[in-house]
Regions:
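Alpha-to-beta junction loops
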Residues: 45, 50-59, 71-73
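Secondary-structure end/capping motifs
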Residues: 99-171
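Ligand-binding "clamshell"
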Residues: 11, 66-80
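Extracytoplasmic ligand-binding site segments that recognize negatively charged/polar headgroups
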Residues: 1-11, 84-88
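A short alpha->loop->secondary-structure connector
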Residues: 10-20
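Small-molecule pocket liners
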Residues: 73, 87-96
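Short helix-initiation/N-cap motifs at beta->coil->alpha
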Residues: 20-50, 62
């Protein structure tokens, strides 16, 4: 979704983000573009920007907050400000897999629904515990303070500029 949100935002500001033409053999999305957009794995974005390989990035959290935390960048806008309550993440499986593992499929979907409910219940009271879990190397592995900035209803645009954004992460 970030690719489309970035392209929408750039176009709304008068910057042509380019377009895709797979029927012409082009899948880069750079045709007639005013800006070069490239793909970098999200966890590598802060280090790639710090190295000077890229000048900015569009990504989900906690990688924007990581740039603020490291002092190498600042978010200029959130996707929530571009499109409130936008569809963010998708869990998809193939029909073949769903038919081969129907019980597993059902259990995974139920577990995700329960986790989402747990994250949102009691006015987000479980978010601090989720931050501790996600900070472990076997999960996201980002610093707790970085994760907390977006998971607990605040967002830091630059060092010291923390704002309440209670609906930033709604599950």
């Amino acid at each position: 979704t970030h690719n489309y949100e970035l392209r929408y935002w750039l176009a709304a500001g008068g910057i042509h983000p380019g377009y895709y033409a797979p029927h012409k053999g082009d899948t880069s999305g750079q045709i007639d573009a005013d800006a070069l957009l490239s793909v970098t794995p999200p966890p590598q974005m802060p280090a790639t920007m710090e190295a000077g390989t890229i000048y900015g990035y569009c990504v989900g959290e906690p990688w924007n907050q990581q740039a603020v935390f490291k002092g190498i960048g600042v978010p200029v806008i959130t996707d929530y400000e571009i499109w409130k309550n936008n569809p963010e993440k998708v869990f998809g499986v193939s029909n073949v897999w769903a038919e081969k593992y129907p019980n597993t499929h059902l259990r995974v979907v139920k577990a995700m629904i329960r986790a989402a409910m747990w994250l949102d219940e009691n006015n987000n009271a479980n978010r601090p515990e989720a931050v501790k879990i996600l900070s472990k190397p076997s999960y996201v592995g980002a610093d707790e303070a970085v994760l907390a900035n977006s998971m607990t209803g605040t967002f830091e645009y630059e060092k010291g500029d923390k704002r309440d954004v209670p609906d930033f992460n709604v599950f």
